[in-house]
Amino acid sequence: MVQVVAALVWKDDKFMICQRPLTKTRALQWEFVGGKVEQGESLAQALNRECIEEIGVGVEVGEVFAEVDHVYPDITIHLTLFNARLSGGEPKMLEHNDIRFITPSEIPQYEFCPADKDILEKIVSEFGGKE
């Protein structure tokens, strides 16, 4: 099982989502910024590194928001999603096709990676009424 970390980044009442590039599996599906944990890294170190690589901005890693295991045809992952804040600057599209900030009510308008399904339901249940 591959350890994966991701960031739940809020800006006011909207959270950040990133669209996977055409060149990767699950092309053009939406996801949270993040990636695989490398050997010797803590989860927080991995998340900060992935954010710098993918969006050009580091993050202040907060508490765990959700954890989920998911089996894809090509990989089995354990995804840990952390509450996080951008540590300076605006996100840039260094690896993704697009970056957006959306409200929980806008989730149905986007095709997310299947591993994010339960996490998105938790976001709606905890934050959906605050719009």
Model features per residue range: what roles?
Residues 9-10, 17, 86, 101:
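Conserved hydrophobic "DFG−1" position in protein kinase catalytic cores
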